[in-house]
Regions:
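N-terminal assembly/interaction segments in proteins that build large macromolecular machines
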Residues: 2-331
Length: 331
């Protein structure tokens, strides 16, 4: 049967599907709108299933607060073209609104909430079928209580943060939310860093310290032999620089011997106490750079101060209760 342009426009407005897909569905459904919508839904599911193994590195991240409940959610897709589309952003916003209205605490809860004519997960799958891109929900996190500030970095919908203070101070809360966006803290304070992370960072610090001390001894021996350490820092460089004439074959062999013998001798005589002290210093630096309250505050007007010092300058008892951060941007 013939399908009118008015019917095509109407169904397209209802579903967001492409004109060709809408026309085909209406034709197969013989003008029955409900049947045509079901055909479009089924085809969308099939298309989404075919794309399940694709990477979703773009998307839309939104944050919102209503009264004492705030949440961040991300709807991921494959391309920035789809991510920046009004329909995609609206779907993300609708899902976030539903999550906040229900005060959902987990992503699994969010996926079951009603959004339009379907639950959130089904709505995402339908949109995936329409666009032809894989889509998935991610990054859902919440804060609940008083004194919460939310921040969408540059309103680009790719990085959002939330901060909760123990006292009402909107300006301080907003600035700390910007700090969280800019400086990517891994924990609120040192006590909040997991034991696993502390152990890993200390092991890395010990290994790096040993490597640097051995390298320093080897480089000193190379320089004493008249060999530029930069020319022999890898076997590949030794071979290529010998071919270029920057090293003689004899120098190349001497460099290999120095790296092996001096390196082994230095590694065997390293002072464990000194290694541990240096590694502990590096771990302290890790805490300073990655714990929110200890980070250098980026939005002050005067002298350098930590985030904790900034808060104390606003109110002596002002503290951060919790924070959340989610981004799709490469960092």
């Amino acid at each position: 049967m013939a399908v009118s342009i008015e019917d095509i426009k109407k169904l397209r407005a209802m579903t967001g599907a492409g004109l060709a897909d809408v026309k085909k569905a209406l034709t197969e459904a013989e003008g029955d709108f409900d049947k045509a919508k079901e055909l479009l839904r089924e085809r969308g599911l099939a298309i989404a299933a075919k794309r399940s193994d694709r990477e979703t590195s773009n998307g839309c991240v939104l944050v919102k607060k209503v009264n004492d409940f705030a949440a961040i959610i991300a709807l991921k897709c494959e391309t920035d073209f789809v991510a920046n589309g009004a329909d995609f952003i609206k779907l993300t916003s609708d899902i976030l609104d539903a999550a906040i209205a229900a005060k959902a605490h987990t992503l699994d809860e969010v996926k079951t909430l009603k959004v339009g004519d379907a639950d959130a997960q089904a709505a995402v799958t339908q949109r995936s079928g329409i666009t032809g891109e894989k889509m998935e929900l991610d990054g859902y996190c919440v804060l609940e209580g008083d004194n919460i500030e939310v921040y969408d970095h540059m309103n680009k919908h790719t990085l959002c943060t939330m901060v909760q203070l123990n006292e009402n101070n909107e300006e301080a809360g907003h600035k700390v939310a910007m700090q969280v966006a800019a400086m990517r803290p891994v924990a609120l304070d040192e006590s909040s860093v997991s034991n696993e992370t502390k152990k890993t960072e200390l092991e890395v610090a010990v290994a790096k310290t040993k490597e640097e001390l051995v390298e320093k001894a080897v480089n000193a021996a190379l320089k004493k032999a008249g060999i530029n350490p930069a020319h022999v820092d890898s076997e590949e460089h030794i071979e290529s620089n010998t071919k270029k004439g920057w090293l003689t074959p004899e120098q190349a062999e001497e460099a290999r011997n120095i790296k092996k013998t001096v390196g082994e001798e230095k590694a065997a005589t390293l002072n464990p106490t000194m290694i541990q002290n240096i590694a502990n210093g590096r771990l302290a630096k890790f805490f300073k750079e990655n714990c929110l309250v200890d980070q250098e505050f980026q939005f002050g007007d005067g002298d350098k101060q930590t985030v904790a010092q900034y808060l104390a300058s606003q109110s002596k008892d002002l503290k951060i209760v919790a924070y959340q951060r989610f981004t799709l941007a490469a960092e």
